[in-house]
């Protein structure tokens, strides 16, 4: 039976709203619900066995991401991809599992190529010694995780490295993209491209050299190292895709 209002205000209610929004978001991103197709609240409520309040909040979440729109007399309709907030971490996750997954991965790598070299240059010039040392520590943890062939450790260390890199730039606008970059890294690890390959040691070394350049205050070298790191990642993914790997 649908939950009552007290439950809707609780953690359980929020989880229900999240489940409905995520289920519909994945269907929209996969094309199961194409642009301009209607979404009927009553139908969704019956399908998920939730109240109108839960459905309404789930719809609000999707509308905030540009994926659906409610119009007077027209009802709620799926919006074209051009209307979606493609930088939203949830939208990135949902698209990653759909037909646009490969294209999105390449697009996000282009975004990283624009953001991370600039962040590296700023970070190297910042004089934020303590934060620079944190970046070097994250690079060291990345190396240990790769040596241990531990995907959870590797993922965590890589996320920490790139978060510190962008935060260390001191640029508030770049920092606004942290959620997007984190989602981009997640989509790379969940893309089907093998994580531990012959290129793993090279990638680990590139992270180390980038951290060293930043800690040394060499802005030119840091910018170049960051650009090389992202470009080599993109090349590896393309090569794996061409050879028959799944992205």
Model regions and ranges:
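Amphipathic alpha-helical interaction elements
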Residues: 60, 124, 166-170
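Juxtamembrane/interface motifs at transmembrane-helix termini
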Residues: 19, 56-57, 128, 153-154, ...
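Phosphate/oxyanion-binding loops and surfaces in catalytic or ligand/nucleic-acid-binding neighborhoods
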Residues: 118, 122, 171, 184
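C-terminal all-alpha effector/ligand-binding and dimerization domain
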Residues: 12, 139, 143, 148, ...
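Short, hydrophobic secondary-structure boundary micro-motifs
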Residues: 36-37, 71, 154-155, 175-178, ...
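Short linear motifs at protein or domain termini
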Residues: 1-115, 121, 243-245
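All-alpha effector-binding/dimerization core of bacterial HTH-type transcriptional repressors
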Residues: 83-164, 202-225
